[in-house]
């Protein structure tokens, strides 16, 4: 029988390292709550990034997935994870940098991603996975609360930006719940939150999404500027294109809907 999450970490002398962006969760009930929010079903193929001391890993395994693949770059955690594997042979441990992983490398059916992501790479991973959304069943992720609010933000709000636009064009997004700093060791300086993203059945092709990325980068770089000024270097006839879409030249980036950006991308 495995010891508690905290005792298991202590037995391996694993302490959080800042260079890995580590904030460990020792509360098994919180880990269970995250897995419940994911709606994980038995016999699913699951991916977890940064399992660390294995708290969330254990909760996922209790749902009896077909296969749980964990990606861990901290070699100190590998022996601990191997001890969990002794009780759960459906655990696949890969020592690798998550930023070098392609979902297609896993050679599995639709992947359910459940992770407490390192905050310094969280946004980048979300965007990468959205671009491979045909391989994803859903993503239930712990991120900084501020990032989750940006993912879920609606037009004409302060948090609305590039991330909001791209996420809403590719997936349905749902904020599940907040997590206080005290839930972690060591406590981070900010609140966290759980968000679930489920890819849409019909999504724009990759070329259009790339154009949306370019347009939103330009638009939100001049967030307080009128959209015709922000996008003046996008196309010489930008005012005509905006008029064609019934978008006022006097709008700002935050006033355009995700579909407005998609329509504009289709004209570029």
From Swiss-Prot:
InterPro entries assigned to the protein according to its UniProt record, in alphabetical order: KsgA/Erm, rRNA_Ade_diMease-like_C, rRNA_Ade_Mease_Trfase_CS, rRNA_Ade_methylase_Trfase_N, rRNA_adenine_dimethylase, SAM-dependent_MTases_sf
Alphabetical keyword list: Cytoplasm, Methyltransferase, RNA-binding, rRNA processing, S-adenosyl-L-methionine, Transferase
Keyword Transcription: no
Matching Pfam families: RrnaAD
Binding site for S-adenosyl-L-methionine: 23, 25, 50, 72, 97, 116
GO molecular function terms noted in the UniProt entry: 16S rRNA (adenine(1518)-N(6)/adenine(1519)-N(6))-dimethyltransferase activity; RNA binding
GO cellular component assignments: cytoplasm
Catalytic activity entry: adenosine(1518)/adenosine(1519) in 16S rRNA + 4 S-adenosyl-L-methionine = N(6)-dimethyladenosine(1518)/N(6)-dimethyladenosine(1519) in 16S rRNA + 4 S-adenosyl-L-homocysteine + 4 H(+)
UniProt keyword Cell membrane present: no
E.C. code: 2.1.1.182
Enzyme class, first EC level, given as a word: transferase
Places the protein is found: Cytoplasm
Main localization category: cytoplasm
Family of this protein: Belongs to the class I-like SAM-binding methyltransferase superfamily. rRNA adenine N(6)-methyltransferase family. RsmA subfamily.
Annotated function: Specifically dimethylates two adjacent adenosines (A1518 and A1519) in the loop of a conserved hairpin near the 3'-end of 16S rRNA in the 30S particle. May play a critical role in biogenesis of 30S subunits.
Name of the protein in its database record: Ribosomal RNA small subunit methyltransferase A
């Amino acid at each position: 029988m495995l010891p508690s999450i905290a005792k298991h970490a202590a037995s391996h002398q694993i302490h959080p390292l800042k260079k890995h962006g580590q904030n460990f969760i020792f509360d098994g009930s919180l880990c269970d709550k995250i897995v419940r929010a994911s709606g994980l079903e038995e016999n699913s193929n699951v991916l977890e990034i940064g399992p660390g001391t294995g708290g969330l890993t254990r909760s996922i395994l209790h749902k009896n997935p077909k296969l749980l693949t964990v990606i861990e770059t901290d070699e100190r955690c590998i022996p601990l994870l191997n001890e969990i594997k002794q009780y759960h042979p459906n655990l696949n441990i890969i020592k690798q940098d998550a930023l070098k992983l392609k979902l297609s490398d896993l050679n599995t059916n639709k992947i359910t991603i459940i992770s407490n992501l390192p905050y310094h790479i969280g946004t980048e991973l979300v965007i990468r996975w959205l671009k491979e959304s045909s391989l994803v069943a859903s993503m239930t992720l712990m991120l900084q609360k501020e990032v989750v609010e940006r993912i879920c933000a609606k037009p004409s709000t302060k948090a609305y930006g590039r991330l909001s636009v791209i996420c809403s064009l590719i997936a349905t997004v749902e904020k599940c719940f907040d997590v206080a700093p005290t839930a972690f060791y060591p406590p981070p300086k900010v609140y966290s939150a759980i968000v679930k993203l489920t890819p849409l059945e019909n999504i724009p092709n990759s070329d259009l999404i790339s154009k949306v990325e370019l347009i939103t980068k330009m638009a939100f770089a001049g967030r307080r500027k009128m959209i015709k000024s922000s996008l003046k270097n996008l196309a010489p006839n930008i005012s005509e294109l905006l008029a064609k879409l019934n978008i006022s030249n006097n709008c700002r980036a935050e006033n355009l809907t995700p579909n407005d950006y998609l329509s504009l991308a289709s004209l570029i």
